[in-house]
């Protein structure tokens, strides 16, 4: 099987979070959010390398190293991200090619602000790749009733049949994902996740059921929820 790499884009500042520092560096149970994010991948023997993509000033000042400490294998030296998430992912993929990855290798892209990824979900995604030539992503079926809003009022109910919430990691062949992101950039298309870039190229990635507690820390309230999730797991042993 081709090697598996990980790209963790953390080039943004998370303006919606409202903290003075980037949300990936905010402390969660006495460790930065991004340290919890990395922990899900460390120790997995199928992962050849983990590529962090960070703001340029964080790399220049070494702020990331002060927060994360020594780089455990297989964490690679970070690279500077771009203005948009898709740009940061693209730059991370290019860095992996310079590190010895090849286009046929698999790459998992995971949000830096998702610190609650379960190891069992990661393993399920990795195991799915043998039968997912067009890629795969963790997702959960939509359970809530969905409303369409107009001028602050509900104007209708959206049929949730067949709807899923996309999570990360999302896994694709490195070369194909890089080409899809470059095509989206050339066409000035909005890319919300890696699957959307691949879907625009006609790909149909597999939806791998994950857990809803793989939340993204976007608002300050999310940090309290993430802390509760991690605390509950710690108590479970």
UniProtKB/Swiss-Prot annotation:
Pathway-wise, it operates in: Isoprenoid biosynthesis; isopentenyl diphosphate biosynthesis via DXP pathway; isopentenyl diphosphate from 1-deoxy-D-xylulose 5-phosphate: step 2/6
Which residues make up the annotated site Transition state stabilizer? 16, 23
Q: Where is this site: Positions MEP for the nucleophilic attack?
A: 160, 216
A Pfam family this chain is assigned to: IspD
Single GO biological process annotation from the record = isopentenyl diphosphate biosynthetic process, methylerythritol 4-phosphate pathway
SUPFAM superfamilies according to UniProt = Nucleotide-diphospho-sugar transferases (SSF53448)
In the record, which residues are listed under signal peptide?
none
Q: What EC number(s) does its UniProt record assign?
A: 2.7.7.60
Q: What reaction(s) does this enzyme catalyze? A: 2-C-methyl-D-erythritol 4-phosphate + CTP + H(+) = 4-CDP-2-C-methyl-D-erythritol + diphosphate
Family matches, as PROSITE patterns: ISPD
The Swiss-Prot or TrEMBL record describes its family as follows: Belongs to the IspD/TarI cytidylyltransferase family. IspD subfamily.
- List the NCBIfam families hit by this protein, alphabetically: ispD (TIGR00453)
Q: What does this protein do?
A: Catalyzes the formation of 4-diphosphocytidyl-2-C-methyl-D-erythritol from CTP and 2-C-methyl-D-erythritol 4-phosphate (MEP).
Query: Can you say what this protein is called?
Result: 2-C-methyl-D-erythritol 4-phosphate cytidylyltransferase
Native organism: Acidithiobacillus ferrooxidans (strain ATCC 23270 / DSM 14882 / CIP 104768 / NCIMB 8455)
Species classification: Bacteria, Pseudomonadati, Pseudomonadota, Acidithiobacillia, Acidithiobacillales
């Amino acid at each position: 099987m081709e090697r598996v790499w990980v790209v963790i884009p953390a080039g943004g500042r998370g303006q919606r979070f409202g903290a003075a520092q980037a949300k990936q560096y905010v402390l969660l149970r006495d460790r930065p959010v991004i340290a919890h994010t990395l922990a899900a991948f460390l120790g997995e023997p199928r992962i050849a390398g983990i590529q962090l993509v960070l703001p340029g000033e964080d790399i220049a000042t070494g702020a990331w190293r002060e927060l994360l400490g020594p780089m455990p294998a297989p964490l690679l030296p970070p690279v500077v991200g771009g203005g948009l998430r898709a740009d940061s992912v693209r730059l991370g993929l290019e860095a992996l090619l310079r590190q010895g990855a090849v286009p046929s290798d698999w790459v998992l892209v995971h949000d830096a602000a998702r610190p609650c990824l379960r190891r069992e979900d990661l393993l399920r995604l990795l195991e799915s790749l043998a039968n997912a030539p067009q890629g795969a992503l963790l997702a959960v079926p939509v359970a809530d009733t969905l409303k369409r809003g107009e001028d602050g009022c509900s104007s209708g109910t959206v049929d949730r049949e067949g709807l899923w919430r996309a999570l990360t990691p999302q896994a694709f062949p490195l070369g194909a994902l890089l080409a899809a992101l470059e095509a989206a950039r050339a066409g000035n298309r909005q890319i919300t996740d890696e699957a959307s870039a691949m879907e625009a190229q006609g790909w149909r990635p597999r939806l791998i059921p994950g857990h809803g507690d793989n939340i993204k820390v976007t608002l300050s309230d999310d940090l309290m929820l993430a802390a509760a999730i991690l605390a509950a797991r710690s108590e479970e042993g």
